[in-house]
Amino acid sequence: RITAAGPACARSRALAGTTVPAPAEPDLAAAPGWAQARRQLAAFLTGRLAAAAGARTVHPVHAERGPGPGRDPSQAMGPVAAAIEYAGAGAIRYALARVPPGAPARVDPCHEAARRLDVPAYAVRYAHAHAASTLRQAADLGLNRGEAAEFGPRPLAHPSEQVLLDELSWLPERVAGAARQARPDVFPRYLERLAGAYFGCQERCPAVWPGMGTGGPEISARLWLAAAAATALRAGLDLLGVDAPDRL
């Protein structure tokens, strides 16, 4: 169902009947400092997640105003703009999105630019890219997932596969829960658990591997699982406004 739903796999009606403020998307590079950038992004993401969970959103009359439509080139570059220029908009946006209320909002651009799995933004995006690569490799090998109507989770019996299935099943509720609490920072952390579950599953139960022979029901099921993981991770990153590259 996740693969068939595409980006809508993260949506639900959990907050139907509620109304939530939805400020305009902030220009993070124009923010004078980290604290303001985090506040503006958190307010925006709360509204965005709430809308995905079925809430009615309204533009607040007294929304916090940013410094304008963009940074004045004649002014010195602020810390957020400098970090975005160094590490990329997606990495900095993700790092800010996961900062909880009350915690220091400062982000280390050198850390966020690193291509390591202990960097949360990179780990989640790499998990998506790995799943997309798995599907490309399967296609190159002539392996077919089969029809969606024929898929059943029965072959996915390994504990690591069950963990990934469980994490995937919570996606819409994690979106709604983050919006309900006005804590968008908890949603990136869910995506990190999902990425970790995917890596654990691929380490123990890979869908493709060098020298593999023909497929079968088990391989088809694993390919569907990889496709579901790729779809869910992309949907989650899209909600955060972070790109989900197919190759890293």
Language model features with spans:
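Non-catalytic interaction-recognition regions
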Residues: 1-248
